Regions:
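Bacterial N-terminal signal peptides that target proteins for export
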Residues: 1-9
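Bacterial N-terminal signal peptides
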Residues: 10-17
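Sec/Tat signal peptide C-region and signal peptidase I cleavage site
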Residues: 19-24
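N-terminal lobe/hinge region of extracytoplasmic solute-binding protein
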Residues: 30-82, 119, 126
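Solvent-exposed coil/turn segments that connect beta secondary-structure elements
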Residues: 32-35, 43, 65-66, 83-85, ...
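Extracytoplasmic/secreted proteins, especially bacterial periplasmic and envelope-associated proteins
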Residues: 55, 65, 69, 73, ...
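Aromatic- and charge-enriched surface segment that lines or borders ligand/interaction sites
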Residues: 76-128, 161
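Surface-exposed binding/hinge segments that line
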Residues: 122-181
């Protein structure tokens, strides 16, 4: 056997060994760069959104794959008031939090979680607003969410209402963005 044939056989054997399936509980993610973090809200890099917002988090509404059409996410339905100032979302029931060795969820996802998610970005007094020193919420601020959202209110455990200061045509698209995770 010549050297070229041996090299090809060795390379083939290595390639076959690499094709062995990874254990079922192992998550393998390849990216062109390192994400800034795994919380998409305070960051702006596509690598962060690709590594966290899309595979890990859900939003009230999401974009239908390959489009800018909004479809249900954590909210199964919603109503918009005639004046465009109130958006009422009806949350899916039975949504479970992920669990792992250090976190065991004690309840299902509910309206309080939606309120927390938006409050931590828009309310500087929220203890989780700057849980990493110096972080900002550039997309949230650029979409003028702090001045747009008057309040996020719990109607009941599975219903949340956003009250806006003014009508905002792209509001539904804005909350489908990765930063709204």
């Amino acid at each position: 056997m010549n050297i070229l044939t041996r090299s090809l056989l060795a390379a083939s054997a290595l390639a076959l060994g690499a094709a062995v399936p990874v254990a079922a509980k192992t998550f393998v993610y390849c990216s062109e760069a390192s994400p800034e973090g795994f919380d998409p809200a305070p960051y702006t890099a596509g690598t962060t959104f690709d590594a966290s917002a899309h595979p890990v988090y859900n939003r009230l509404v999401e974009f239908k794959k390959g489009t800018t059409e909004v479809e249900p996410g954590l909210a199964e339905s919603w109503e918009v008031s005639e004046d465009g100032l109130e958006y009422t979302f009806h949350l899916r029931k039975g949504v479970k939090w992920q669990s792992n060795d250090v976190f065991t969820p004690t309840r299902d996802f509910n309206a309080d979680d939606v309120i927390f998610s938006y409050d931590r970005q828009g309310n500087k007094d929220n203890p989780w607003h700057e849980y990493i020193a110096g972080i900002t919420y550039e997309y949230y601020t650029a979409m003028e969410m702090p001045s747009l959202i008057k309040s996020v209110e719990k109607v009941d455990d599975n219903t949340v209402k956003f009250v806006l200061n003014r009508p905002e045509a792209p509001f539904m698209a804005n909350i489908a963005m990765p930063v709204a995770s």
